[in-house]
A protein has these predicted regions:
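Residues that scaffold, gate, or flank divalent-cation-dependent active/transport sites
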Residues: 1-135
Length: 136
């Protein structure tokens, strides 16, 4: 149950599960940290976002959400793939360890090595996202 006036931290297994309750919340989503899930979250009006780094990948492909969301003005971070299961938002929230974050998240106190829970709580301070992401 949502508490009026309190920013909610919502774990989801996939960005495809985004619903109307996502707006203004901090989401911890078990999806890869690429532009697709980031765009869906931005369109949903998420306050801040934590995704899975899925092992980072070649040329940092698993982190492309971070600069994308930085440009839009949304704090975001990724958890280390070795710390929590992919596609399991609750596991990420409980056991996840931050591997990377964008400058906006860093400015709120988020840093590599921090627990996902602590990072999510810090991101509750973020200004609600009100941008209009480009669908391209």
């Amino acid at each position: 149950m949502a508490i009026p006036g309190k920013v909610q931290i919502i774990p989801l297994d996939s960005a495809t599960q985004l619903g109307p309750d996502a707006a203004g919340s901090v989401l911890v989503i078990g999806s890869q940290a690429t532009a697709g899930p980031a765009l869906w979250a931005a369109k949903a009006g998420v306050r801040a976002l934590i995704l899975h780094d899925t092992g980072v990948g070649k040329d940092g492909a698993g982190l492309t959400a971070l600069p994308f969301l930085q440009e839009l003005g949304m704090p975001s971070a990724c958890i280390d793939s070795k710390s929590a299961r992919i596609s399991d938002g609750k596991d990420m929230l409980v056991r996840g360890i931050i591997s990377h974050c964008n400058e906006l998240a860093y400015g709120l106190g988020t840093a590599a090595g921090q627990s996902c829970q602590e990072a999510a709580e810090l991101m509750c301070q973020a200004t609600p996202f009100e941008g209009q992401p480009d669908a391209s």
